[in-house]
From Swiss-Prot:
The lineage of its organism: Bacteria, Pseudomonadati, Chlorobiota, Chlorobiia, Chlorobiales. It comes from the Bacteria. The keyword Ribonucleoprotein applies. This is Small ribosomal subunit protein uS9. It holds the Pfam family Ribosomal_S9.
Amino acid sequence: MKEVIDTVGRRKTSVARVFMTPGKGRVIINKLPVEEYFRDEVKRLHALRPLVLTEKTEDFDIKVNVKGGGLSGQSGAVSLGIARALTEFDEAARAVLKQERLLTRDPRMVERKKFGRKKARKSFQFSKR
């Protein structure tokens, strides 16, 4: 077994590189504790969901470098990266994570703005006369 498990998670325009080692349960994101980086509890819980579901919150030290996008996309990227790292470590966790759809990259991206319109779908006001 490898000492350090290195995986990548992506969501929207965010990319998270996850480095997982056996340890005491410390999670560091961009050199900050997870509580400081994701101050919003919902985003923090979303990022750490794979650890909670597999009941391995105290078994690993996780170091994450994440860049791009906003906090919502970053928490999704971190979640996918952690889920992929857990499956590399323990194949039994794969079934639980797959059932919760945590191993699937979310394909939803921002729709591009079209010319002749205000935004992707919103048009300028239409006047019949």
